[in-house]
Design a protein with these regions (language model features):
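Short glycine/proline-centered loop/turn elements that form peptide/ligand docking sites
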Residues: 96
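Intrinsically disordered, low-complexity serine/threonine-rich segments
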Residues: 19, 368-370
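Bacterial N-terminal signal peptides
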Residues: 18-30
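Terminal "cap-and-tail" regions of soluble proteins that handle hydrophobic small molecules
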Residues: 35-89, 99-365, 372-377
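Short, well-ordered alpha-helical segments enriched in acidic and aromatic residues
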Residues: 92-93
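Intrinsically disordered, low-complexity polyampholyte segments enriched for Lys and acidic residues
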Residues: 6-9, 369, 375
Length: 377
């Protein structure tokens, strides 16, 4: 019969297995995970990731490498990050783009309705510096990327001597972006028009096709998806879904208004283990970017845990300010900062999917099938 003196020993023996299990789990969770998947390993070898890069990936950090490009005005990056969640959870979170994207570098964001309408852009407010610059905007000399028609709109529809210039400018900007998305949905790349902010007009569709025509191999060929991005709105791949959103991004340079077209393309039972490919096609940006395309490959593969996957990212963009002596000095700086921004964004994706709790300092409000989000306070 147990006595009062030996009862603690029995209790200790009962607790011992749980203590050991807890310790083992703690060590396992704190240790890097050595991902081993034939498809992803092949891609990473092809991109010449180092042993240090792989250790960083296994430790849960995003790894980003700058890629060589054939022209100076193009930047390209390959990235990988391991995410402790299923690809399905990622897609579910990502589809709620307003909550997913918002953060310190994204003070404003909204998703367009299935049939875009003015209310989708109601919260959009241009940065004060952009409003001031628009007062001096002329074809061939404008601080913002605008078509000749848009420059005329700001000149003709805004009373620049009025006390409510900001309200008028923002109203014109919202109308301009709404028209852009509607026309793009009807006519595709032809509706993207030309930028007339510099001496030489720049065809946005031409810049996008140059990005699309890159010879750098993709992690996995997706010809139907690429053809759709080029031929939109025709021949959408079976099973693909899409949406459009706008945002104001601010990562330390000029805050930039961007409009993006997102296509989520599922790959059923692909031998590679890639379950989805996500394309993010830039339609417009007020600064820096002439065109941009990001492709994300969600590779579950045969890793140690089906609840984990690896996200492979390939980003290409055409940018300003890389010509001449000044451009040769600036390009390495722009490239380094852009690479750091891509790395930071991939780690943001990881946090959003693994935790995904919206910060209390921001507020979102649904507007039918659209969403808008602005920084609170």
């Amino acid at each position: 019969m147990a006595t009062a003196a030996n009862r603690p020993d029995h209790a200790a023996r009962r607790l011992f297995p749980w203590a050991v299990l807890t310790a083992v789990l703690a060590v396992a969770l704190a240790s890097p995970i050595a991902y081993s998947d034939a498809f992803v390993d092949t891609v990473l070898r092809r991109e010449h990731l180092s042993a240090a890069d792989l250790r960083a990936r296994d430790a849960g950090r995003a790894v980003v490498k700058a890629l060589d490009t054939s022209v100076r005005q193009e930047l390209a990056y390959f990235g990988v990050v391991a995410i402790n969640a299923s690809p399905e959870r990622f897609i579910d979170r990502f589809a709620d783009i307003v909550r997913f994207e918002r953060g310190p570098g994204v003070p404003q964001i909204g998703r367009f309705s299935a049939s875009p309408r003015a209310e989708d852009l109601a919260p959009l407010a241009l940065p004060p510096a952009d409003i001031a610059a628009l007062a001096k905007c002329r074809p061939g000399d404008c601080a913002l990327k605008l078509s000749a028609d848009a420059i005329s709109r700001f000149r003709d529809r805004v009373d620049w001597s009025s006390s409510n210039v900001s309200l008028q400018v923002n109203a014109v900007a919202r109308d301009m972006l709404l028209d852009l998305v509607r026309k793009y949905q009807a006519r595709g790349n032809a509706a993207l028009g030309e930028y007339h902010d510099d001496d030489e007009p720049l065809s946005v569709a031409h810049e996008f096709r140059a990005v699309l025509a890159s010879s750098h191999p993709l992690p996995l060929p997706v010809p139907r998806l690429l053809a759709y991005l080029d031929d939109y709105p025709h021949n959408r791949p079976a099973g693909a879904t899409e949406f459009f959103y706008w945002s104001v991004v601010d990562f330390g340079l000029k805050p930039t208004v961007r409009v993006n077209h997102v296509v989520i393309y599922p790959l059923d039972a692909d031998p590679s283990g890639v379950s989805h490919v996500i394309a993010i096609k830039q339609l417009y940006a007020t600064h820096y970017f002439r065109s941009a395309l990001e492709l994300r490959f969600l590779a579950a593969g045969q890793g140690p845990d089906p609840r984990r996957f690896q996200l492979l990212s390939l980003t290409r963009s055409r940018i300003d300010g890389t010509s001449g002596v000044r451009g040769s000095l600036l390009r390495p700086i722009i490239s380094r900062r852009s690479r750091n921004a891509v790395r930071g964004y991939l780690e943001h994706l990881k946090r959003q999917v693994e935790v995904g709790q919206p910060p209390a300092s921001q507020a979102c409000s649904p507007a039918a099938d659209a969403q808008v989000c602005v920084e609170a306070g």
